[in-house]
C-alpha cells in the first residue's frame, strides 16, 4: 500500500528525476526510523552459487544503484545480493537527457543512459562504507571515449580496483547504449577479452589471497549460433558465471505504445520471454559447466520460477522492482 502511494507520486515526475529522488531518499533514510517504509523481514533461503553463499536467490540488477549509494537500503528490503554499477575507470556523464522512459501499458522501461557514473574510485569508497551483510556484485564497463580495440584495458583497470571489495565481478559487454560495446560478445574479440580477464583474476587472487568470481553479462538480441559460441568461450576461459540478459533493442511487443520508438534498451515485461529463452539455450549449451543468473522482465514469483526452471540458479530484478516495489523481493523468495 505504501509503495503504491509512493509510486503514484513518483510516476508523475520525469522518469530519471524520480529515480534520482528515490536514490537520494534511500540514502538519506537508511538507519533512521524512516527506513521502516521499506525495511522488511525476508526469510533466509540460502543458496551457494559460484562458490559464494547467498542469503536468498533474489538480487538487485545493475543499473539502479550505479554508484553504490544505497547498498544498505536495498539490503534492508531483503535482497540476497546487490549488484552495483555499471562503473567505468573514469567518471562520465552518459548520454544527453531525457534518457529514461516508462512504457506504462507494458510495465517496461527504455533507457539510453550510457554508463553515467562517478567513476570506479567513488564506487569503491561507497562499497567500503556499506554495512550490508549480503553479497555485493560490482558491474564493470568501459568509458565511452575508450576505443573498442582498447576496451579490455578499461575492464582490467576496474577489476584491479574493485577486486578486493567485490563478492563477484560482472563484466558488462552487452549494453546497447555504448557504441560498439556489443561487438565484444563475438568470436575472437570475446575470447581475447575473456582470456585477459581470467589472467587478471588469477593474478589478483594470488595478490589478495581470495578468489572473486567473474560473471559475463550478455544481450538478449543474439542468434542461436552466437549463444552457442558464447557458451563455448565461457567454458574455454573458465569464467565463473553468466548473467542473462541485458536490455533488448526489439520493439515488437510495445509497438504503438507511448515512448516505444525512443532509442535505447527496453527492459521489463516485454523482455521476459526472450530473456528466458536465452537462458534456456545457454543452459543447454553449458550443461552445468557454470551457473546462470537470470534477469529480464521478472515481475512476479511465477516469472522468477520460469527463469529458474529454464536454468537460472539466481535471479535479479530491476524494472519489476520499479513497478512493484520491495514486496516483489519477498514474494519471489517465499514462492519461487
Curated annotation (Swiss-Prot):
FMN binds at residues 62-66, 86, 139, 172, 217, 245, 268, 297, 318-319. Its EC number is 1.3.5.2. Pathway: Pyrimidine metabolism; UMP biosynthesis via de novo pathway; orotate from (S)-dihydroorotate (quinone route): step 1/1. It is found in: Cell membrane. One of its GO terms (cellular component) is plasma membrane. It comes from the Bacteria. NCBIfam families: PRK05286.1-1, PRK05286.1-2, PRK05286.1-4, PRK05286.2-5, pyrD_sub2. This is Dihydroorotate dehydrogenase (quinone). It comes from Photobacterium profundum (strain SS9). The lineage of its organism: Bacteria, Pseudomonadati, Pseudomonadota, Gammaproteobacteria, Vibrionales.
Amino acid at each position: 500500500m505504501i509503495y503504491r502511494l509512493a509510486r503514484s507520486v513518483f510516476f508523475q515526475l520525469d522518469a530519471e528525476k524520480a529515480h534520482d529522488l528515490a536514490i537520494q531518499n534511500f540514502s538519506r533514510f537508511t538507519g533512521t526510523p524512516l527506513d521502516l517504509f521499506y525495511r522488511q523481514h525476508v526469510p533466509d533461503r540460502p543458496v551457494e552459487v559460484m562458490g559464494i553463499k547467498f542469503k536468498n536467490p533474489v538480487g538487485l540488477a545493475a543499473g539502479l544503484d550505479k554508484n553504490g549509494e544505497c547498498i544498505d537500503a536495498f539490503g534492508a528490503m531483503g535482497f540476497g545480493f546487490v549488484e552495483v554499477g555499471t562503473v567505468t575507470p573514469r567518471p562520465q556523464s552518459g548520454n544527453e537527457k531525457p534518457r529514461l522512459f516508462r512504457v506504462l501499458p507494458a510495465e517496461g522501461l527504455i533507457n539510453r543512459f550510457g554508463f553515467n557514473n562517478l567513476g570506479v574510485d567513488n564506487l569503491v569508497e561507497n562499497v567500503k562504507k556499506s554495512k550490508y551483510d549480503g553479497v555485493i556484485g560490482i558491474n564493470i564497463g568501459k568509458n565511452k571515449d575508450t576505443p573498442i580495440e582498447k576496451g579490455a584495458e578499461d575492464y582490467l583497470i576496474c577489476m584491479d580496483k574493485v577486486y578486493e571489495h567485490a563478492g563477484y565481478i560482472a563484466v558488462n559487454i552487452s549494453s546497447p547504449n555504448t557504441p560498439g560495446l556489443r561487438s565484444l560478445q563475438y568470436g575472437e574479440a570475446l575470447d581475447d577479452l575473456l582470456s585477459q580477464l581470467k589472467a587478471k583474476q588469477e593474478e589478483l587472487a594470488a595478490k589478495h589471497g581470495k578468489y572473486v568470481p567473474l560473471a559475463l553479462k550478455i544481450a538478449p538480441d543474439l542468434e542461436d549460433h552466437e549463444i552457442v559460441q558464447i557458451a563455448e568461450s565461457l567454458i574455454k576461459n573458465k569464467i565463473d558465471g553468466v548473467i542473462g540478459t541485458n536490455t533488448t533493442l526489439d520493439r515488437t511487443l510495445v509497438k504503438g505504445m507511448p515512448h516505444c520508438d525512443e532509442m535505447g534498451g527496453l527492459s521489463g515485461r516485454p523482455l521476459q520471454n526472450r530473456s528466458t529463452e536465452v537462458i534456456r539455450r545457454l543452459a543447454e549449451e553449458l550443461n552445468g559447466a557454470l551457473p546462470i543468473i537470470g534477469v529480464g522482465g521478472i515481475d512476479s514469483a511465477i516469472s522468477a520460477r520460469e527463469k529458474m526452471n529454464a536454468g537460472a540458479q539466481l535471479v535479479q530484478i530491476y524494472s519489476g522492482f520499479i513497478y512493484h516495489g520491495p514486496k516483489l523481493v519477498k514474494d519471489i523468495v517465499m514462492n519461487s
